[in-house]
Amino acid sequence: MRKLSPIILALALSPLVQAEPVSEVSPVGKIDGMVSLPVTGMKAVESNGRIVFMSDSGRFVIDGTLYDAWSKKPLTSLEEIREAGNTLDLSRLGLKMDDLNPLTLGEGKKKVVVFVDPRCPHCHELLKQALPLTKEYTFQILPVPVLGPDSERQVRQLGCARDKKAATDALLNGRIGNLEQDDACNLEPMQRTLVTAQILGIQGVPFIVANDGRISRGRPNDLSAWLEGR
């Protein structure tokens, strides 16, 4: 998936691997701490009691205030920046889940948003872990085509299914091709889901947003424990 825009709270990037040369070629002195920014190619670096923002190469350094437009506050410490990159309050984005027409698994009071690709093995493992938790949680499943043309076809079949419960069952058991399709299918929810994934910077699945806003980029080893914050 391609990113729609470099927005704060998108997917964090891989860690910087050459910290020593970076300190040599930049105006930053001793590096006391570093956090990956959810912005392409940038890190937040703490040095001598102040925070600056540095390109991955170390060539460019920006001195200023980082403001999170989604949560409407400045981020003034590495801990705040780290938390901003690892949590997500979808309500602050004005996002209505009904507009995305998610597949639903469970009937619990706690809502969990899950982006999956129907052809993703780790996504299926995640959904298996979700099945015993459906009394406590409601999993709102948003299929996105990460793995190519076959995924695009299956996502469309899920989105255009006449029966949403049948679509959820088909996703779980891998029989998407047997779904009865709605000839007058509305493609808007699928398009909105894709745009939402791009805005959030989702580059891989599964991507999970817990009921308390914590993010998991990938499948937790123990879904139940992760949802409980353990």
For each predicted feature, which ranges?
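Short acidic-hydrophobic, aromatic-tinged amphipathic segments that line or gate anion-handling sites
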Residues: L158, I215-G218
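Extracytoplasmic thiol/disulfide redox context detector
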Residues: A19-R156, A170-N173, Q181-V205, A210, ...
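Positively charged n-region of N-terminal signal peptides that target proteins for export
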Residues: M1-L4
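Bacterial N-terminal signal peptides
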Residues: P6-P15
